[in-house]
Design a protein with these regions (language model features):
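Short glycine/threonine-rich loop-to-helix capping motif typified by GTGT followed
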Residues: 19-21, 174-188, 244-256
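Beta-strand segments within the central parallel beta-sheet cores of soluble alpha/beta enzyme folds
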Residues: 2-3, 50-54, 166-170, 236-245, ...
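Glycine-rich, mobile lid/loop segments that gate access to catalytic sites or pores
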Residues: 6-7, 17, 28, 32-178
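A structural-propensity feature for long, helix-poor, extended segments
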Residues: 9, 114-129, 233-256
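Glycine-rich anion/phosphate-binding loop at the beta-strand->alpha-helix junction
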Residues: 144-230
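Alpha-helical support elements that line or immediately flank enzyme active sites
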Residues: 1, 85-107, 210-234
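Short, charge-patterned binding micro-sites
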Residues: 2-18, 247-251
Length: 256
């Protein structure tokens, strides 16, 4: 997040005692991640003047004892996970979600190649009316030619939307200050975007920052794999798989 003193990054969580992750390791990982995702420093988030805190702690002994087993590893927490697939797209993902992801991928390429663009952006696609509505917000330099940018983004959208569309580019107007300087970031805040979009229910757990013992991640991936194979083998047009677990138990409580 941005601060008055140049920015702050807090790395927290619980890890296995055998991981042997040092503070130097954390600093290296953080700096590498930031350099991949941020081009421009701001007064309140300066890549060369950050305060980086390592607050990783050992995992609870109660959780470790419940999860670790020589034969069957137990689930790292309780939870409900959802996997989904549809034959409406080649990726087996919901159509508007698939379109938005493809637009975002092309936009990412443009951002990395154009010195007038920074790397903060998001895409929203909705359909159901006469036109497909596409909202794109992308961070830029103050001196950018917005007419040129609109043309470039319109071309990206037209390559991914087959029907007639309406593009709303940077509806807030100027978007110069972005990334952690513009918004406080936190892992797990966008679980619907990380999954399938709003047309498919989510179990509630985030994917990021978790090892495979955390079924929020591993069981969600397994449920998606099962749903995708059911649709790919033409056993259904759409498939939603739901699975639930209790902490410490190797077998799911429910699979539907």
């Amino acid at each position: 997040t941005g601060t008055k003193n140049g920015g702050l990054v807090l790395v927290g969580g619980e890890i296995s005692e055998i991981a042997e992750i040092t503070t130097d390791d954390v600093l290296t990982i953080v700096k590498e991640a930031l350099n991949k995702t941020i081009k421009t420093s701001f007064e309140d988030f300066d890549l060369d003047n950050l305060s980086i805190y390592n607050e990783l702690t050992p995992q609870s002994e109660e959780i470790r004892a419940a999860v670790e087993d020589d034969e069957d590893q137990g689930a790292g927490d309780q939870g409900i996970m959802v996997g989904f697939a549809t034959n409406k797209t080649k990726s087996f993902m919901p159509p508007t979600f698939d379109i938005s992801r493809n637009i975002q991928k092309s936009l990412w390429d443009l951002q990395n190649s154009d010195e007038m663009l920074d790397l903060d952006s998001k895409v929203q696609v909705t359909s159901g009316g006469e036109k497909t509505k596409v909202v794109v917000s992308t961070q830029h330099n103050k001196a950018i030619d917005m007419e040129k940018l609109f043309h470039e983004v319109s071309e990206i959208v037209s390559n991914n939307v087959e029907s007639e569309f309406e593009l709303d580019l940077n509806p807030s107007g100027s978007f110069v200050k972005g990334g952690p300087a513009g918004d406080t970031g936190l892992t797990g805040r966008k679980i619907v975007v990380d999954a399938y979009g709003p047309s498919v229910p989510v179990g509630g757990g985030a994917f990021s920052g978790k090892d495979p013992s955390k079924v929020d991640r591993s069981a969600a991936y397994a449920a998606r794999h099962l749903a995708k194979n059911i649709v790919a083998h033409k056993l259904a047009d759409d498939c939603l798989v739901r699975v639930s677990y209790a902490i410490g138990k190797a077998e799911p409580y429910e699979l539907t």
